[in-house]
Amino acid sequence: MARYRGPVEKLERRLGVSLAMKGERRLAGKSALDKRPYAPGQHGQRKAKISEYGLQLREKQKAKFMYGVSEKQFRRLFAEAARKDGNTGALLIQLLEQRLDNVVYRMGFATTRRFARQLVTHGHILVNGKRVDIPSYRVEAGQKIEVIEKSKNNPQISRAIELTAQTGIVAWVDVEKDKRFGIFTRKPEREEVIIPVEERYIVELYSK
């Protein structure tokens, strides 16, 4: 299954959560989910009973769409998490958080992961001084993530940094906003990652 490229706000309403895909509108309380917090369509306001499988599928979709990964990428990451010692669900979230596009977003250089992915694919991001244009690149502790020199005054990046003052920066990165770089200091603990996903349902889904 390819990466989702459809209407973002309709997807958020269907899943019932903000996926941080339209950051500035969401922060301003102007997203479709804020105005109409129910599923789209004629019967969207009805509360339908959801099955166990439906719950499992919904949580997987939320994680996939939030981090912008394809089904193939998601399965590969889950398989890797399942091979490791520890809580599979927590390890899956940790692997998703280590994606370069997500780290760029977490450092406040982009208002959404979608824009962060564009910054990476268009060559605006350096990792330890070398250009990396692969959004799925895995960032390790101690690596320096930097906006290239000619893009440091990009108005969209500057606006994202301004908005970060409202949302704050996560604890596992250190960022020099004015210099447009940050250090990924460590892998996050699960309880530090505040996302509306119950990964235990994802583990149940893939464990069948």
From Swiss-Prot:
UniProt-listed GO biological process terms: ribosomal small subunit biogenesis; translation
Pfam family, one: S4
Domain S4 RNA-binding stretches: 98-161
Any one cellular-component term (Gene Ontology): small ribosomal subunit
Keyword flag Ribosomal protein: yes
Gene3D superfamilies from the UniProt entry: Ribosomal Protein S4 Delta 41, Chain A, domain 1, RNA-binding S4 domain
Entry keyword annotation includes Oxidoreductase: no
Source organism superkingdom: Bacteria
Keywords: Ribonucleoprotein, Ribosomal protein, RNA-binding, rRNA-binding
PROSITE patterns noted in UniProt: RIBOSOMAL_S4 (PS00632), S4 (PS50889)
GO molecular function, one term: structural constituent of ribosome
Family per similarity comment: Belongs to the universal ribosomal protein uS4 family.
Annotated function: One of the primary rRNA binding proteins, it binds directly to 16S rRNA where it nucleates assembly of the body of the 30S subunit. With S5 and S12 plays an important role in translational accuracy.
Subunit structure, interactors included: Part of the 30S ribosomal subunit. Contacts protein S5. The interaction surface between S4 and S5 is involved in control of translational fidelity.
Protein's name according to its UniProt entry: Small ribosomal subunit protein uS4
Organism annotation: Campylobacter lari (strain RM2100 / D67 / ATCC BAA-1060)
Lineage: Bacteria, Pseudomonadati, Campylobacterota, Epsilonproteobacteria, Campylobacterales
